[in-house]
């Protein structure tokens, strides 16, 4: 969590985004399911780093720093954008802007990119969990949903697979990027 004006980010989120945008960013191992693994020890091994003292606080922090330096070097144009959502406020500002943007999630071990839009700037957060923002996945046309009653909408949305609503936790430093990235994905290419 974040307390203003402090900032923090999650290196794993940054690594997932970098690897999703360019699978050549880091050398990775594969999981048993055949997905790229971004486990720190495996990344260290694949980059040729010494892993003899892995799992000590100092060594893991230093390894993370070296991996993030590789990402920064290979993603110079996007590095500042990767870090721009390091506070809850910065993410909430984006969600309230009524824009269209790219978000990234790890779903069943696969890094996924989604083209999403805020539902409504005044009603885009969970009523009980204020840091949960709701976004609409634009692989579906939202137009037919606009005139449904709330109850019909709830029933209709539960039928979608993959799910039509994405949840973004604003206090977990998610990476939110320009829509141009997700528009390259097959699911959104015709928009």
Question: Could you describe each region identified by the protein language model?
Answer:
Residues 70-191:
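Acidic two-metal-ion nuclease catalytic site recognized across multiple nuclease folds
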Residues 1-76, 82-85:
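Metal-dependent phosphoesterase core characteristic of DEDDh/y 3'-5' exonuclease domains
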């Amino acid at each position: 969590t974040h307390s203003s004006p402090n900032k923090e980010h999650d290196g794993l989120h940054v690594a997932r985004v970098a690897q999703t945008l360019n699978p050549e960013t880091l050398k990775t191992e594969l999981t048993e399911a055949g997905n790229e693994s971004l486990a720190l020890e495996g990344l260290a091994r694949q980059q040729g780093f010494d892993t003899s003292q892995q799992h000590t606080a100092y060594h893991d922090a230093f390894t993370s720093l070296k991996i993030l330096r590789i990402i920064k070097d290979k993603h110079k144009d996007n590095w500042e954008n990767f870090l721009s959502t390091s506070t809850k406020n910065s993410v909430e500002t984006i969600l309230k802007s009524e824009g269209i943007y790219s978000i990234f999630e790890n779903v069943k071990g696969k890094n996924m990119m989604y083209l999403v839009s805020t539902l409504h700037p005044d009603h885009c957060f969970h009523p009980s969990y204020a840091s949960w923002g709701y976004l609409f996945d634009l692989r579906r046309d939202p137009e037919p949903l606009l005139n449904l009653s709330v109850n019909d909408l709830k029933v209709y949305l539960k039928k979608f697979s993959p799910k039509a609503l994405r949840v973004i936790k604003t206090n977990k430093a998610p990476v939110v990027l320009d829509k141009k990235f997700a528009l390259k994905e097959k699911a959104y290419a015709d928009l």
